[in-house]
From Swiss-Prot:
GO terms for biological process: positive regulation of DNA-templated transcription. Its main location: cytoplasm. This is HTH-type transcriptional regulator CueR. Keywords: Activator, Copper, Cytoplasm, DNA-binding, Metal-binding, Transcription, Transcription regulation. It comes from the Bacteria. Cu(+) binds at residues 112, 120. The keyword Transcription regulation applies. The gene is cueR. Homodimer. Residues 1-69 form the HTH merR-type domain.
Length: 138
């Protein structure tokens, strides 16, 4: 198979496939006499794994580890499960951080009258300025 065939079958662009090759994330393809890359089913499997792992949040380094596990006949499913659960925990931490940010933004929005006044508690809060609050207290 050539690179365009692999791109169609994996849903990756030719550029992405070359990038993964340059990063050493997939087994290097053989070269035909004319210098074109020749891919096998193994390459399809590795590239599909990379695409799907990226879609669920694994970074490039983690994807490389998953490809190595894929190619290791002595791998243990416990290793794959451990990495997957670590990724879940990381995503849960990120979700928690995002929810906290959302709560802070909503609290700021609720404190703002949203009228034609130049005074804005949101700007005051974000800038650390208490000018707005000091005027209200007087």
């Amino acid at each position: 198979m050539n690179i365009s065939d692999v791109a169609k079958k994996t849903g990756l662009t030719s550029k992405a496939i070359r990038f993964y090759e340059e990063k050493g994330l997939v087994t290097p393809p053989l070269r035909s006499e004319n210098g074109y890359r020749t891919y096998t089913q193994k390459h399809l499997n590795e590239l599909t794994l990379l695409r799907q792992a990226r879609q669920v949040g694994f970074n490039l380094e983690e994807c490389g580890e998953l490809v190595n596990l894929f190619n290791d006949p002595r791998r243990h499913s416990a290793d794959v499960k451990k990495r997957t659960l670590e990724k879940v925990a990381e995503i849960e931490r990120h979700i928690s951080e995002l929810q906290s940010m959302r709560d802070q933004l909503l609290a700021m929005a609720e404190s703002c009258p949203g009228d034609d006044s130049a005074d804005c508690p949101i700007i005051d809060n974000l800038s650390g300025c208490c000018h707005h609050k000091a005027q209200k207290l007087r």
